[in-house]
Every structure is written in C-alpha cells, then in structure tokens.
Amino acid sequence: MSRAAGWSRREFLAFGWFPFFRPKHISLAGARFNILRNGRSPRRYLLVHGNEETARAVLTRHMETHEGIAYLIESQTRNVPVDTAEIDPNRMFSRAGAEASLNRLNPNLGPPQLESALQALDRGRERLLKALLPTGRGLLIAVPNNSDEYSVADEQPISDAVSLREPGNPHAFFLCTDPADFALIAESAYNVVLQQKKPVEDDGSLSRLAANRGVRYVNLEVRMGNSDRQTEMLRWLDSILP
C-alpha cells in the first residue's frame, strides 16, 4: 500500500498543502482555469481570454522559470458559456458588469434566463476571486493580447496618470492600479497608465475590481502575435516590481 493510500483523515487535513493535493483547476460558470504553480511565491498571473494564444504561450513558458501561481483559461474562444448564454470572462467580476455583458452578447435573453445566469456567477465569484487576488501587498499580473481595435489611447481618458515613452507603439503598454508600481514602470522605456481611483462605471473587469479593492494589479497588453515583445516586457516587469 502506498503512503498516500494509508493516510488517515487527520493526516490529509494536516498535510493538505502538499502539491499533489492542490487543485489543478478552478471554475466560475463556464470559465474554467488551469492552475500552474512554480515555487512558493505568492505572485499571481492570469490569462482570461481563451483566443489570446500569444499570451497563453508566453505565460506558459514564463512559469517554467519564474515562481508564482498562474491561472490560464481553458477555453479557446473569447467568450465563455454561462447557463444558456455567453459572457466576456473579463466582465464577470461584478454583477453590474456581468449583466451588461450578458445583455450585449445575448440580445434575446429573457429576464428569467438573465437572472439565472447572474445567480450562477454570484454563487462562485468570490471563490474565484479568493484564488486570483493576492493577499497583503502581493501582485497580480494579467497577460492579454490586443488588435487594431484597442490600444493605450483607449485608456488615456479614464486614467489617473499616463507615461508614453513609446507613443509610436500604442499596442504595447502596462495598466496598473498602484501608484508605486506606476512610478517604477514610468521610469522605463515602456508605455504605462495608472487607474487607481474607483471608476464611475463598473464594467466588471478585473482591473476595475482590483482598483476598487486596493489590490496591486498590472495588465500587460501587447499586440497578438508579438510574443518576443510580450516575453521581454513580462520578464522585465517581474524583475523590477517587488
């Protein structure tokens, strides 16, 4: 009999922190995330949109050499199912944001179906957030990709501070919620915006929630397909921020 098979319930509870007892997945409605762990660092990483394959590859490789916990959505599509509808997974971190996303993506969704989807998200949201959000002064790094439709120019009007060291490359930039992190990044050759204040509109994104809760959060945006640049910026960010 193996040692694990012979353990008592008390031993399982006492030693449940062992790596082979840690969950490998966590879900909220139809958004299921693979969990990659390396070492003991409390740093968190996130890939929230399944169609951003450049970011997926960059983050997966990064976790081979850097400590922390990464959450990578399993879906290969941008949106995920919830009940009988679909939602943008980066709009599900608040009820208001989730409702707006559900209405936009599912124009024929009736009130009972809408409420059912919202309740499904309400039941599991805090459990997911407890896993994603670091404690204390820990850091969460999100690694998305963008296209021609989105750049740092979209964030400038709603940001508290802006540093554009690469105005000719608006698709590569950092978005952060902590002024100290912003100050460090602003000294670099990269574009960065600060969004610390609670926004007037709650769009359900993780950056808005992090700002609201005072969580250190950095979003690393790079154009889809530019893996070398995203790798460079992620390694640099990990080396410069405490």
Go through each PLM region and give its residues:
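Structured catalytic-domain cores with a bias toward divalent-metal coordination
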Residues: 7, 13-242
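Secretory targeting signals
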Residues: 1-7
